[in-house]
Amino acid sequence: QLFAIVSMLMIIPSVVAFVENDYFVARTFLYSCFAGIIVYALIAIALSNITKVQNNFEKLISFILSYLFLPMLMAVPLFLSLDSVRFQDSWLQMVSAFTTTGFNLIDLNTSSTGSALQLWLLMGSWLGGLFFWICAISILLPLNISRFEIGAADLSDGTSVKRNEPINPIINCARQLIPIYIIITVGLWLLLTLAGVSGFKALLVAMSVISTSGFEPIKYEVGNLFLIEAIIFLFFVFALSKSLFSREINEFQKRKIYNDPEIRLAVIIVFSVTGLFCANSIFKSILENAPLDFVILFKNLWGIFFTVTSYLITM
């Protein structure tokens, strides 16, 4: 089903390219969309007689294989739209996006590439973040191989899986998490727009931040840099702990936020590392007999604080 969803989503960058009068890229995305839907339909027909329900291990294998084959589909319009790019480079670029790694092989920030390809790259990372979030709760959590089992000892039966597990936990999790994911993304998009970032660029930044992909689609305006970073930092908090989202999914998470072990650990790490770097800057100034400029010190402190937090949420 995700194969068909990714194929249909290609219509969005196709429309963007058409609006920009980039008809070649628009046709590339549109034809890739049709080809993906046809391939999905053929596979669905071939497997229609198979009624076996996957167990958790088989779901894990499917989850892993998704990171191999879905980026191949995502890479097709990227490869066809850029003459000087090999398919393996396009595939690795989309693997980087879908896994929210943020490793950039192809520079799409030039004026010659257009907005559609930039949007598709960020859509890939945004979908990858949502995909991993859903699968981490519905697949990795029952197998106890993710960090989501922190606090699971509070359950009465000593496990991290509910006994009344739904027939299809992936769909159940998706119904609960997709609206939250969309609302957070739209909220960040609107706030960045109010801060002075253009609508399209704000959307790219919002998808990059919420998916924790690390892609930097734009260069911020210097005058609004602190305000933009402050807004982004507010949304970093949502990535620090699962209990901020999934209270209904896991009963053991019904506790106060300040008692959450993940929040406490994040606060300790961020303030400790920031304090060490700040102390190092002050110590260097003392050794060099340089006067302390508190404005520069505050900027350095904020930069360290922001950077440490951004690294932490990608872990």
Model-derived segments and spans:
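Membrane-proximal intracellular helices of multi-pass ion channels
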Residues: Q1-M315
